[in-house]
Amino acid sequence: MNTIIQRVEFPDNRRILMLSDIHGHAKGLEKLLKQVHFSKDDILVIVGDLVEKGPESLRTVRMVMELCRTHTVYPLMGNVDLWRLEHLFSDDPAVHQAMISYSIKARGWWKNSFLDELCQELGFIPEEAEDTQALFARLREHFAAEFDFLLHLPTVLETQRMIFVHGGIPHERLDELKETERIPLMKWDHFYEDGLSFDKYVVVGHWPTTLYSKGMPMYNPLIDHNRHIICLDGGCGVKDEGQLNLLIYPDWRSDECELHTWTDLPVITALNAQNASTDFDYIRWGDHEVELLEQGTELSRISHHGRAMTVPAEFVWERDGRTYCSDITDLRLSVQPGDRLHLITTSPLGAFVKKDGVIGWYKGRYHSNA
């Protein structure tokens, strides 16, 4: 599929809302829009990846379709959206089986998959289908409206000051991209690290911002006013501690914005003060190979780039003879009594939490808000 470019001019004096990578978290989208009092006077841009990696992909698609009908909304296609469409429109039984196998695995990660949801509405269990070609043909017929909506999502949205694209663009000569394949613009891993700069702001999703955090383990948007790049993806659905990031600009001409976030993590209230640590390490995907120093039942001792760290034992795992650790830090957060923290997990080390988009440890007493 070739790149589809949409050009619009935003009217003056209307709020511009933007988020990306909803990944089937319809509840999060719904709560965020309610929280910010989203109205027909606003403009919403959704920078790709509506489906998968969350519990309500089908509801998310239908919600966005309805928002497009009732409000001013500009959704873009993401790489996961495209891949799912390619699989659903394939007549190859091997592709069908691969999607079914993925769905079985996805139940352990996110409760279900996009394919599971589609089949559930029709009363099927994907792996019980004797004729996958017939099954997928029936899905295409029953969900023709939803699939058509996804198929026609643009790749790039250009406005007066901003260019929105799920993965990234190599330059701002957008007409040159019209005849190119769209997938490289949707799946541009570590786009921000490639050193590009632009005249207009380029707003992307796809790559969780925490993967750019060489120091502070931050999940909030990355905004670079020098290079004119905004990275929105808070890792929702990809990481247990991920979040949906919603940026709001009061007007298309404004440089100032406000951030609203959503996460499904439970909330606790801190009862004690705690000072932040100044010396800490952060292990993240892509830089998560470690040396196992001591294996315990609750806690394990590991080494990451020569620095020893004690972590919850369940964070350490092996694959192909190598040892890895899930995203973790030994950062101790600055906390005051009354602070609301999002609880990721607990261990003998304390409570592993997120505060203002930053993950770390809180070792004091707390009250559960459940």
Language model: regions and residue ranges:
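SH3/SH3-like beta-barrel superfamily modules
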Residues: 285-312, 335-370
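Active-site neighborhood of divalent metal-dependent phosphoester bond hydrolases
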Residues: 60-154
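Active-site environment of divalent metal-dependent phosphoester hydrolases
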Residues: 23-27, 52-55, 80-85, 205-214, ...
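SH3/SH3-like (including bacterial SH3b) beta-barrel domains
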Residues: 271-286, 321-346
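Short, basic/aromatic beta-hairpin or loop at an interaction surface
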Residues: 258-271, 306-322
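Divalent metal-coordination and catalytic microenvironments
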Residues: 21, 44, 49, 64, ...
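Acidic, His/Gly-enriched loop-helix segments that form or flank divalent-metal centers
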Residues: 127-229, 236-240, 252, 257, ...
